[in-house]
Amino acid sequence: MKLWFSTLKLKKAAAVLLFSCVALAGCANNQTNASQPAEKNEKTEMKDDFAKLEEQFDAKLGIFALDTGTNRTVAYRPDERFAFASTIKALTVGVLLQQKSIEDLNQRITYTRDDLVNYNPITEKHVDTGMTLKELADASLRYSDNAAQNLILKQIGGPESLKKELRKIGDEVTNPERFEPELNEVNPGETQDTSTARALVTSLRAFALEDKLPSEKRELLIDWMKRNTTGDALIRAGVPDGWEVADKTGAASYGTRNDIAIIWPPKGDPVVLAVLSSRDKKDAKYDDKLIAEATKVVMKALNMNGK
């Protein structure tokens, strides 16, 4: 009799345990299912925010952001092509740093007034003496000097060589074909001198944060970009006070306005961000505020706007 009673109690206990497990599993599934609509709503809200900016500024946006600490991303037209404009200067200097030693950067490059193009704020002052590769990189990244970009591009073998080096680091998208300032004339549907937000983020990360360059050269590249003089109204204007930004801006026909950047919050790992934009008419003007406002949406989507 006692044996029968004990067996009955064991069966009841097992049934209760089984029911509890099923109930817990149901709760877990409910929690998972509950979080999915929330995430979907956040993504919908983010896309709506970007779409509103496009309508407000009469422009098209291409955005990709990567939080390198969590691998979270923000994407809006991340694989649509835009003229890369002067953002390519960051990747050009990245390849230069791959090919040249730190000592080689002291090599002096001579040039003439025939090498000056449409925007040469630094190189035009040094025609008589020439400039070192290091000085040219500084001029290209910090002042967006077009002659400096062209002289560096010639040093690494021209646009075709730049393209080959980008392919080696896994960038199958970015398509350099011309020198400054011709590279800024890109008509809708053309692929020459274009890239995507995702590709630019991936390549910038490879040069500045990963092992495509040794640490000493990464620090040099980042230092130049942190001291950029052309980006105060763009991504820098869209991040909270106290954050560090290393960026490279660009502008081209069809109201193209771009900025690619590495962003360091006070706490946490860097975010790599590309904000690309264009308009419908060839002679359209751009508005820097669009880039700043889009950056704010990215920060909100990454839950970093008040971090």
Curated annotation (Swiss-Prot):
Q: Which InterPro entries match?
A: Beta-lactam/transpept-like, Beta-lactam_cat, Beta-lactam_class-A, Beta-lactam_class-A_AS
Compartments reported by the entry: Cell membrane
Q: Which residues carry the S-diacylglycerol cysteine lipidation?
A: 27
Q: List the active site.
A: 86, 182
Q: Where does substrate bind?
A: 248-250
Q: Which domain of life is it from?
A: Bacteria
Signal peptide (from-to): 1-26
PROSITE patterns reported for this sequence: BETA_LACTAMASE_A, PROKAR_LIPOPROTEIN
The catalysed reaction is: a beta-lactam + H2O = a substituted beta-amino acid
What PTMs does it carry? Answer: Large exopenicillinase is the primary secretion product; it can be converted to small exopenicillinase.
Gene Ontology MF term list: beta-lactamase activity
Q: Which family does it belong to?
A: Belongs to the class-A beta-lactamase family.
UniProt protein name:
Beta-lactamase
Species assigned in the record? Bacillus licheniformis
The organism's lineage is: Bacteria, Bacillati, Bacillota, Bacilli, Bacillales
